[in-house]
Amino acid sequence: MVTPDKDFAQLVTDHIFMYKPNSFGGGYETWGIPEVQKKFEVERPEQVIDFLGMMGDSSDNIPGLPGVGEKTAKKFINQFGSMEGLLSNTDQLKGKMKEKVEANAELGRLSKELARIMLDVPVTFDAKDFELDHPDVEKVKQIFQDLEFRRLTDNFLKHFLESRRTLRHQRGNKE
């Protein structure tokens, strides 16, 4: 995955990595499981969902639990493992924090759901839906010339003609 969005860290596995572009260009960071564990102080990447649910994320309109910021969320993940673990063990909290967490349990559950990237959406895939029609070469050529894309015009024509020959050959239609 190539994204600057920390939410996607929840999807990192042994076989799925996150390539996080650096701000203002200039390379990227590669996040595997160890990097996610270190950044969020979690045991498993899927705990990022709980972490974000606890502390909230204003850029994604996730409210989080009132009074819980990054440090407290890391502490709670370490101590309770999940939002559910936190909410079922509020007796271990003290003072105002206990009151806030108990009073906002539903908000915490909602925040966790808002932080979860849904993977069980129905997706149908038919490769034919992605086949491109042949472009109107003359129209494309005219647009490129109007925009003075000389090299792009030459490259387009060269690659288009090559790919058309290859496609015809693969289909056994040697015109």
Locate each region found by the language model:
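Extended two-metal-dependent nuclease catalytic cores across DNA- and RNA-processing enzymes
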Residues: 1-124
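Low-complexity, acidic/Ser/Thr- and charged residue-rich accessory regions of DNA metabolism proteins
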Residues: 103, 113-165, 174-175
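Low-complexity, intrinsically disordered or signal/transmembrane-proximal segments
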Residues: 169-170
